[in-house]
């Protein structure tokens, strides 16, 4: 943005328009993001900007310029505001956790449908991150017991805060390298593991993911290593007729289905996300 140090007064309409121009090269929604960032600083709703032209104090304006500069460098909006909406829940996020994606709501949707069919379900989530999936599930099923694990202690701290913020108390959070600290059986195991093949990405795509934790994004062996590990080891932790639900890349459908079949799973099905791309594959233990 141009140097505005000589300006005595700042008004929301003007600086949002300036900010939108400034962010137009980094995002497809520059005005929306400009409004969200200013609303976050002012602790107001962005719709207020359409009701009146707000006067902005100099300190708030300086904070705004600082956030805009970070956004222009590629830092995700969710990390700048410290929050992200998922399944109609506003979750705390920082650079220790993956930013929840809309595609992952399919994992929640399918898991909820199976929970309703199971009496006394006991659910394990592998790689909980911000806690998005487990909290969304537990919020709608307060009488069911959930266990959510992650290898990152910082991620578990964020997940616990999110659970408290949403008054969810039926999740046991544990630090664990996949199944290493798991010692019981479950009716359902659900996971959105790292599945991105870094070698397939362009430099621009890598830079867009730069601020998010590599451990939550990338997996070896063409992005298949974590999925393979989960499928091969999950049978030992599933009860009879238990279900394994895994999110994966659109081009990993055949791999997931084949691995599930090789490891004794039946009734294997894959579901498409909102973009009509294969996203979640489910198998049943017999």
Place the predicted regions along the sequence by residue:
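Conserved AdoMet
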Residues: 39-113
């Amino acid at each position: 943005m141009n140097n505005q140090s000589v300006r005595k007064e700042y008004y929301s309409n003007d600086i949002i328009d300036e900010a939108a121009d400034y962010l137009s090269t980094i995002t497809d929604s520059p005005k929306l993001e400009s409004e969200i960032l200013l609303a976050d600083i002012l602790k107001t709703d962005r719709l207020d900007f359409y009701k009146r032209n707000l006067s902005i104090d100099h300190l708030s304006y300086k904070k705004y310029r600082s956030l805009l500069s970070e956004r222009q460098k590629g830092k995700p909006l969710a990390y700048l505001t410290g929050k992200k909406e998922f399944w109609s829940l506003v979750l705390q996020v920082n650079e220790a956790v993956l930013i929840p994606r809309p595609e992952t709501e399919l994992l929640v949707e399918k898991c909820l449908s199976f929970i309703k069919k199971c009496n006394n379900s006991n659910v394990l989530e592998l790689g909980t991150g911000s806690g998005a999936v487990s909290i969304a599930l537990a919020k709608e099923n307060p009488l069911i017991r959930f266990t959510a694990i992650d290898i990152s202690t910082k991620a578990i701290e964020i997940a616990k805060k999110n659970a408290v913020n949403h008054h969810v108390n039926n999740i046991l959070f544990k630090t664990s390298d996949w199944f290493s600290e798991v010692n019981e059986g479950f009716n359902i195991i659900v996971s959105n593991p790292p599945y991105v093949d870094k070698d397939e990405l362009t430099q621009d795509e890598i830079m867009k993911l730069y601020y998010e934790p590599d451990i939550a994004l990338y997996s070896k062996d063409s992005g298949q290593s974590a999925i393979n590990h989960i499928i091969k080891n999950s049978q030992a932790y599933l009860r009879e007729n238990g279900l394994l639900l895994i999110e994966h890349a659109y081009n990993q459908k055949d791999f997931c289905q084949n691995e599930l079949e090789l490891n004794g799973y039946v009734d294997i099905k894959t579901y498409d996300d909102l973009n009509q791309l294969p996203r979640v594959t489910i198998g049943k233990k017999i």
